[in-house]
Structures are given as C-alpha cells and as structure tokens.
C-alpha cells in the first residue's frame, strides 16, 4: 500500500540522515 511505501521511504531517509550525522561526528574525531 502507499502508506507502507511512504513508511519505507521515510525509514530510508531517516537512516541516511542518521548515518550522515554520525559520519560528521566521527570523521573529525578520526582526523587528528
């Protein structure tokens, strides 16, 4: 159903944003 598709897209987007934030927080720590 469209609602499930929307939920899947939202989850994918949310995961991408979370990974992006984690990368922004982790990468500077890895680069002295």
Curated annotation (Swiss-Prot):
Top-rank taxon: Eukaryota
The name this protein goes by in its record: Allergen Asp fl 1
Ion transport found in the keyword field: no
Keywords carried by this UniProt record: Allergen, IgE-binding protein, IgG-binding protein
GO molecular function: IgE binding; IgG binding
Organism classification: Eukaryota, Fungi, Dikarya, Ascomycota, Pezizomycotina
Disulfide pairings: none
